[in-house]
Amino acid sequence: MLLFDFLDVIGFLGPYIVFVISVIQLYSYSYYLYGYLVIVAVSQIMNTTLKLIYKEPRPSGARSILGERYIGPEKYGMPSGHAQTIFTSIMYLYCVTGKLFWLYLEIFIACLTVFQRWKFNNHTPKQLFVGASLGAFIGYVGYLMNYYFIGDRYEMYMNEKNYLLE
C-alpha cells in the first residue's frame, strides 16, 4: 500500500514536478524558458476562466490527498487544471528540446496525475480529457508563438550584442 500511496502523491504533485523538470531543462534555452513561464501563467488564467464559464462541478464524493479544499473557481472541475498544466509543460518542453527521455518521464508522471485525479474522484474522464487536450494545445501554440515571434528577434539581438563585443 505504501508504494501506491507514494504514487498517488507523485500524481497529485505531478504538475509541480514537471514544472521543475521543465525549468531545469529549459535553463540553457533562455528565451524559451521565459516563454515557458509566460505560457504556464496564461494556461492557469485560461483554466480559471474556463472553470468560471462552464461551472461544471467536480464529481460528488471527491477525496483529498493532502487536505486541499476546493473553493471559488476550484470547486469546478471543467477543465482539469492538473491535466491542463502538466500537458502544457510536456508539449512545450518536447517541442523545444525533442528529448525522448524527458518526454517519456513526463508522460509517466502525467499518467500518474490523471489516474490520481480520477481515482480520488476529483474529475470525470471528460474533464481530464478536455484538460489534457487543452493543455497540449496551449503548449504547442505557446511554443510556435515563441519560436516565430520571439526566437528570431532574440537570435538577432544576441548576434548584434556579440558582434559589438568583438
Report the location of each language-model feature.
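Short, surface-exposed, charge-dense and proline/glycine-enriched linear segments
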Residues: 87-96, 132-138, 154-159
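A cytosolic-side transmembrane-helix exit/cap motif
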Residues: 52-62, 123-131, 148-157
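Membrane-interface helix-loop junctions and terminal tails of multi-pass membrane proteins
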Residues: 66-70, 113-118, 122, 136, ...
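Hydrophobic alpha-helical bundle signature of multipass membrane enzymes
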Residues: 1-78, 84-119, 140
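Alpha-helical transmembrane segments that form the membrane-embedded catalytic/substrate-binding core
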Residues: 82-86, 123-147
